[in-house]
């Protein structure tokens, strides 16, 4: 295990009351969290989203990406389902950090796409480590997942890490004129499945 479970509290939201569970990475002290809705015990697959932190989309309502839209719709679907988990994966900007994300945005303003911008800054297209999420699922006792994602790589990595993903549930939301190039790049260069 790369993580330990350290704290929990109720989190009232517009979608209902979630249980917020905090985790800490053993090696770095970095924190991550899970939002649990309803009773997730048992063998029935749990509707879940692994949502990577995006301050600009999640909290500042940026139209450059689809992240904030995905977060809101994932919480809505989990609440409608009556049970589920949203893992909030604290790896901002596909794990390049907030300041480098701002630098990447500046390069995109000059014509680079999201992948080219990361490469120009010396990063891979995606620096995230999803194995941490596998440990969170295990610590929560989740045996099978219906994963809300458009990213087949996320499904592959979590499956390799021992998570039983029984279904990939598409989450195609938030398309707008400000992010159409970004979404096209995610589909063409990163393999995201964005066709309805």
Curated annotation (Swiss-Prot):
Catalyzes the conversion of GTP to 2,5-diamino-6-ribosylamino-4(3H)-pyrimidinone 5'-phosphate (DARP), formate and pyrophosphate. The lineage of its organism: Bacteria, Pseudomonadati, Pseudomonadota, Gammaproteobacteria, Enterobacterales. Belongs to the GTP cyclohydrolase II family. InterPro entries: GTP_cyclohydro_II, RibA, RibA-like_sf. Zn(2+) binds at residues 54, 65, 67. GO terms for molecular function: GTP binding; GTP cyclohydrolase II activity; zinc ion binding. Keywords: GTP-binding, Hydrolase, Metal-binding, Nucleotide-binding, Riboflavin biosynthesis, Zinc. The keyword GTP-binding applies. Its EC number is 3.5.4.25. Its cofactor is Zn(2+). It is an enzyme of class 3 (hydrolase). The gene is ribA. The active site is at residues 126, 128. The keyword Secreted does not apply. GO terms for biological process: riboflavin biosynthetic process. GTP binds at residues 49-53, 70, 92-94, 114, 149, 154. NCBIfam families: PRK00393.1, ribA. This is GTP cyclohydrolase-2. Homodimer. It catalyses: GTP + 4 H2O = 2,5-diamino-6-hydroxy-4-(5-phosphoribosylamino)-pyrimidine + formate + 2 phosphate + 3 H(+). Pathway: Cofactor biosynthesis; riboflavin biosynthesis; 5-amino-6-(D-ribitylamino)uracil from GTP: step 1/4. Gene3D superfamilies: GTP cyclohydrolase II (3.40.50.10990). It holds the Pfam family GTP_cyclohydro2.
């Amino acid at each position: 295990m790369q993580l330990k479970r350290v704290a929990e509290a109720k989190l009232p939201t517009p979608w209902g009351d979630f249980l917020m569970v905090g985790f800490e990475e053993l090696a770095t002290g970095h924190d991550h969290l899970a939002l649990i809705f309803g009773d997730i015990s048992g063998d029935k697959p749990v509707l879940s989203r692994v949502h990577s932190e995006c301050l600009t989309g999640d909290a500042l309502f940026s139209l450059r990406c689809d992240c904030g839209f995905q977060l809101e719709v994932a919480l809505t679907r989990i609440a409608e389902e009556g049970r589920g988990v949203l893992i909030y994966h604290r790896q901002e900007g596909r794990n390049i950090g907030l300041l480098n994300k701002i630098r990447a945005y500046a390069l995109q303003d000059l014509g680079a796409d999201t992948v080219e911008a990361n490469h120009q800054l010396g990063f891979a297209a995606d620096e995230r480590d999803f194995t941490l999420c596998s440990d969170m699922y295990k610590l929560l006792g989740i045996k099978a997942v219906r994963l809300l994602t458009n990213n087949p790589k996320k499904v592959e990595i979590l499956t390799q890490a021992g998570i039983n993903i029984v279904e990939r549930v598409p989450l195609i939301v938030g398309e707008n004129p400000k992010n159409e190039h970004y979404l096209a790049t995610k589909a063409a260069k990163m393999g995201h499945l964005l066709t309805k």
